[in-house]
Amino acid sequence: MTDFFKDIPAIRYEGPDTENEFAFRHYNPDEVVMGKTLKDHLRFACAYWHSFAWPGGDPFGGQTFERPWFGDTMELAKLKADVAFDMFERLGVPYFCFHDADVRPEGDTFAESTKNLEEITDYFAEKMDATGVKLLWGTANLFSHRRFMAGAATNPDPEVFAYSAATIKSCMDATRKLGGENYVLWGGREGYETLLNTDMARERAQAGRMLQMVVDYKHKTGFAGTILIEPKPQEPTKHQYDYDVATVYGFLKDFGLEGEVKVNIEQGHAILAGHSFEHELALARALGIFGSIDMNRNDYQSGWDTDQFPNNVPEMALAYYEVLRAGGFDTGGTNFDAKLRRQSLDPADLILAHVGGMDACAAGLKAAAAMLEDGKLEAAREARYAGWSEGLGQKLLTSDLAEISDLVIAKGINPQPRSGRQERLENLVNKYL
């Protein structure tokens, strides 16, 4: 272990009454819920970028964090890895996630950047063997460098498309080498600032071609993980093409990839798109493309994607209810795509932020499991649609408009509204929180 987190103990479960801030109150990794441990249900992962690469800047000010690993050398990249895996061990998280740019210095050429990535992932492999920590997913940063200012796959310059494709290949290779369970595509610059200089049809076709190549390369190389798209409506672009789950599904259908690609849904991105987190999860489940989640929260007053650590247990209970209804995670998990506030300078802040987030998620999942096991919500849902399971409902599904019109006249059908009982169900949910 490094000395960055010196005097901070390994985090253990001590129960809800503990006064020890460096302990879990709700997350007992070995606790069995619905036949599975919380560790296996939640599949926690730490995000390398926010925890170890973000300098603490915002649109109005620069760096506030002073980390001993900040710099552009392989030596510092390895120090960063030492500290990262130290934190993973102290928290007991089973997974981590990274972009290429988070973990290796940028080279003067693509070949040099790739060599740096290969070297640091060799170092990661040693760390992973020593600690047992695994890779939930890898991805490519195709949005920070100025070459990507007009997009990656959707860029008007074919050379940027080529550079992006090569970068994705190198990151998929790194993910496969480390046994990553997913590969994520987030199109931060895959959108537009103005329609005045944008050929949307062309850009959409380019994005489709890139995704097809990603899927082809997955099969060619035998990558056993899941390809995931992470929706977001805007920021940093005015409009992003993978706006939300529904938009992504339409895109996948258009290119015949709905059976190949799933979604990684972020709480903050759902809010930016005008949805609740549970809406996006429920829709992904209904469409058969639910894959993984990025857990965080937004400041609802500012309207920005603030990437704060989650702390709202009722919100998380409703989210994990949809995750459990989807059968839980397969290759996916709960990645903390969350960052400290820029005034939270101390090493302890980074540990405590994750402790609080993990506890809140555990409390939310246990509440969701209790709701599901109790069965009252599902029973109410089934009762509401019971008419479609027999008799008239089944007949309507195999009839045409003329037949149904004749039926309404013959039977004198004159339907009367029934209560949706929303308040009753909301009261029921509060019983478990």
Swiss-Prot record:
Active site (UniProt): 99, 102
Question: Main EC class of this protein?
Answer: isomerase
Q: Which SUPFAM superfamilies match?
A: Xylose isomerase-like
UniProt KW keywords:
Carbohydrate metabolism, Cytoplasm, Isomerase, Magnesium, Metal-binding, Xylose metabolism
Q: Which GO terms describe its biological process?
A: D-xylose metabolic process
Subcellular location per the Swiss-Prot or TrEMBL entry: Cytoplasm
* UniProt cofactor(s): Mg(2+)
Where does the signal sequence lie? Answer: none
Q: What is its main location?
A: cytoplasm
Q: Which residues bind Mg(2+) 2?
A: 266, 269, 305, 307
Q: Catalysed reaction per UniProt?
A: alpha-D-xylose = alpha-D-xylulofuranose
Q: Name one Pfam family in it.
A: AP_endonuc_2
MF GO annotations = magnesium ion binding; xylose isomerase activity
> Which residues are Mg(2+) 1-binding?
230, 266, 294, 337
Superkingdom of the source species:
Bacteria
Which EC number(s) does the record attach to this protein? Answer: 5.3.1.5
Per the entry, the cofactor note is:
Binds 2 magnesium ions per subunit.
Any one Gene Ontology cellular component term annotated for this protein = cytoplasm
HAMAP family associated with the record: Xylose_isom_A
How does it associate, per the subunit comment?
Homotetramer.
User: What family does the database annotate?
Assistant: Belongs to the xylose isomerase family.
Q: What is this protein called?
A: Xylose isomerase
Q: Which gene encodes it?
A: xylA
